[in-house]
Swiss-Prot record:
It comes from Schizosaccharomyces pombe (strain 972 / ATCC 24843). Disruption phenotype: Hypersensitive to the alkylating agent methyl methanesulfonate (MMS) and the cross-linking agent cisplatin. GO terms for molecular function: 3'-5' DNA helicase activity; ATP binding; ATP hydrolysis activity; four-way junction DNA binding; four-way junction helicase activity. The gene is fml1. Residues 416-582 form the Helicase C-terminal domain. ATP-dependent DNA helicase involved in DNA damage repair by homologous recombination and in genome maintenance. Capable of unwinding D-loops. Plays a role in limiting crossover recombination during mitotic DNA double-strand break (DSB) repair. Component of a FANCM-MHF complex which promotes gene conversion at blocked replication forks, probably by reversal of the stalled fork. FANCM-MHF also promotes non-crossover recombination in meiotic cells. It is found in: Cytoplasm; Nucleus, Nucleolus. Residues 80-248 form the Helicase ATP-binding domain. This is ATP-dependent DNA helicase fml1. It catalyses: ATP + H2O = ADP + phosphate + H(+). The keyword Acyltransferase does not apply. Its EC number is 3.6.4.12.
Amino acid sequence: MSDDSFSSDEDWDELDTQVVDKIENEYHNNTIGLNGYSVDEYFDANDSNRYRLQHELDESAAQQWVYPINVSFRDYQFNIVQKALFENVLVALPTGLGKTFIAAVVMMNYLRWFPKSYIVFMAPTKPLVTQQMEACYKITGIPKSQTAELSGHVPVTTRNQYYQSRNVFFVTPQTILNDIKHGICDRTRISCLVIDEAHRSTGNYAYVEVVHLLSLSNKNFRILALSATPGNKLEAIQNVIDSLHISRIEIRTENSIDISQYVQKKEVDFFPVDLSAEITDIRDRFSSILEPMLQKLNKGNYYRIQNAKDITSFTVVQAKQAFLAMSGQNFPANQKWDILNTFDALATFAYPLNLLLNHGIRPFYQKLREVEEECFVGRSGYKKRIINHENYRPLMDDIEILLRDQSFVGHPKLEHLERIVTEYFEKEQTKDTRIMIFVEIRSSAEEILRFLGKFYPNVRPAIFIGQSAVRKAAGMSQKLQNETVKQFQKGEVNTLIATSIGEEGLDIGEVDMIICYDASASPIRMLQRMGRTGRKRKGYIYMLLTRGKEEAKWERAKDAYRTLQDNIVSGRGLSLSEKSYRILPEKFRPVCDKRVIEIPKENEEVVVAPKKVQLRTKIKKKFFMPENALNGFITASALGKPKRALAKSEESPFEICPVTYSIEQEKKLEKYKRVCLRGLDIHRNRRLSQLSVTGRIPHSLATKSIHSFLKHLNTIDSQKAQEWRREINNQFQVSNINSTDRDTKQPKMHDFRQPLHPNPMTTLKRKGQHNSFSYDKSTLFYDNNNNLEEDLPDVNISISSRNEEASKTKPFDDRQQRLQQLVEKRKRMKGMLI
């Protein structure tokens, strides 16, 4: 049932009657959701039957679960499948011990039990998705017609068709996440979710978001998580458990009792490598250039390492963070930024120094050239201090001389690598064998490829890197990656030089020797590298480690791996989830049916990619060309000929029907002609008899006065307007006679001041020299008194008797005074406007 719906009658039938009544009552009283709970959370808290089945169940198939015996039977696989069918399980097995087989068996049984539901297998990359899909075809016999491979390269319309017609999907996590968010994939139909490389399920990775979205509206789905190592630390493993609702961990190591018989012996040899004289000289000279910056940090006790030869980017960044957290808050801005920029510059040049010691002179030189380009493009004053150092340019010149020598070996590791690889392939019994070399950075991989290419055809090397472009170096396309893997599996390539992309997930094939060109401090990466060999026959592992820091890094990785495995097996420090709900009804107790699975013929056929179907009509292109420009193909003979003129269609002029106005309409028209001035734009709007209602703030008194005046003005007829015009003309004639007296007399202050309660009669009597004019004007005021009283019908104030009552009676109360002031203000406004 969805979070926001109560209308489904089928969901209500399985609930207890009392629970239904209670929910309906609270729903009608609008009390559900006030505490922030969703409908599913409310059901979880109040429903006695938490295992409501959402998917259509095949009851006959639910009586048993099928275990294929097409391949050799292994106890640990059988035991893990038995647990994974009924709980959310995290399976941690070394590489090559059949995690895909376990997932395929679980998927097959859920498809049998719930034939109309969705079975989803998620893998982080498209090559992994394709590989797992082909493996499931061969193991469980799921027909190809029921499966689909979905990634971002598949159009949305095609994915929508697959969701309507198929049930088993092999997808990348971001693709199905987008489909769920946009409603293309019905999340309530998913009954089984398999997650490959589950150690990625932390933070905001798409795995975590997919499981979260499914949990919001679907409690009937099983989760099976697969990984060689679930995490570097217990905190990371706990994050995976919480994100994927894991209720059980099935972990095996190469020393486990039920695993040891299926694991071939592996020989691990260490080759400690001493630095060459050239590398030592370059290290010392470059360290002396970094020494002034290091001493600057040492004086303030911001960085403890005293020797520039021992600095690393990691320790510099740690010291910078400690400075910001503790001391950096109390420093002046200039001094603080000076220290931070020094940290940044030192961390930038510490990384090339690490490349020099562990990978060689060429990667060191290439990295410094990249830093130089960054400095000249951006504003990097502190880094330029290193580049502009007097000893920096001579050092780079000497390195360039060394690299021009074709016989020069950039690091002693390459000499050890040459001896190991050439001797191994010279043996007769190892002509069909393969070697895989792991390296952290691409520049080292490219140098190894050039170095081993000299020993062709005994050594046939190929590089295997990621798709993303780094700096100026482009990555490998997915097509080229797949071709390289196939060539390695067929034996056309017998030495594969891989970065971290070769460590995770991909089925590279049979590898008899692993060479680790550098050490990784991560237990996950260490285990994944070593797990590539020793699957069907004895494996060899060679570690090429520079003496000192790289040796210590390897020892730390081994210790961390042992401690981590012991903690996982014992369960110390881990808390499992309780959200692993039962999906099959309790009355069904399926028993195991071991049988040979028939593989459909369609699964063995080579799939030809279908041609792309054009689902949308092409949009007609718009060419922004000048008028009368030639477009398209035109012959030379047609260039001199004039274009054929198109027939012009002459339209007849539009006839305007004569209109006669009535007498009243003519008067209105004349009125508008008189009012409208040149350049005045008048828009006749709808007449409002009342002012519109406002919100919290009422209309001002000025607005109300103007509205009342305009309303009154609209009621004036033409005869009254003519009378007013004559009276005003007479008043102007009288005022011109008395103008000489006013001009010679100095104005006084009371001539400009208006009283609070002006009375036209009393005010005009004070000015004896204006009696005739003032009396006429007061008459004009009193002509409008009736209309003013109509504007405020609730005000019972007599204007004619107001002055007499004011002298005999007590003052008015506050309300009457305010109303009186409003009436007189409107009178004053109308008189002024007229």
